[in-house]
Amino acid sequence: MTFLKRVKEYVGDAFRAAKYIGQGMGVVFDHMGRRPVTVQYPFEKLIPSERFRGRIHFEFDKCIACEICVRVCPIDLPVVDWAYNPELKKKELYSYSIDFGVCIFCANCVEFCPTNCLSVTEDYELATYDRHDLNYHQVAMGRLPSKVTEDPMVTPLREFAYLPKGVIDPHDLPAGSQRAGKRPEEILAEMRAAKAAKEAEAKAAKAAAE
């Protein structure tokens, strides 16, 4: 009886082992047909999506020190240093800073800013060796980042950032797959074509009137 029990356990263990090996090989075979997804950073970079919220850009001259950004921030992050100027009868901004080591990039400050002095950029390269370097003041926040598409030293990887509508897996896509919506260069081309057509219509109308 003990012998038969041991044989039964052995056969059961063998079937379980075969099942687990089959599951593992299924994962292996599934990945064998996929395209490589390794990004050779920093020589290859992803193009951020249309609504990507990266580093916040700040324009010092537009800020009126209303501190709305501080009130709408979930963690009261922006530090606004100002003083009232009795001669001008308004606030005078001295400094403005945001610690991106704490920021959650919700962009509430951008949405509620009455003067549009804050805006989100496509800059996501904020890594540093010292967390104190992530505390950006108005000068650092005033710098505009360079675009990935305009950097000759970088290969922009469009296919991993822009997928067709309804597709969430970047693998096994046809070579000519396009993302949902239009790319920036396509939008610019349409705007230029519309402008040229409008100018042509205006010239034709002017010529007809003469």
Curated annotation (Swiss-Prot):
One of its GO terms (biological process) is photosynthesis, light reaction. [4Fe-4S] cluster 1 binds at residues 63, 66, 69, 113. Residues 54-83, 94-123 form the 4Fe-4S ferredoxin-type domain. [4Fe-4S] cluster 2 binds at residues 73, 103, 106, 109. The keyword Transcription regulation does not apply. It is found in: Cellular thylakoid membrane. Its cofactor is [4Fe-4S] cluster. It is a peripheral membrane protein. Keywords: 4Fe-4S, Iron, Iron-sulfur, Membrane, Metal-binding, NAD, NADP, Plastoquinone, Quinone, Repeat, Thylakoid, Translocase. Binds 2 [4Fe-4S] clusters per subunit. HAMAP family: NDH1_NuoI. Belongs to the complex I 23 kDa subunit family. NCBIfam families: ndhI, NuoI, PRK05888.1-3. This is NAD(P)H-quinone oxidoreductase subunit I. It comes from Synechococcus sp. (strain JA-2-3B'a(2-13)).
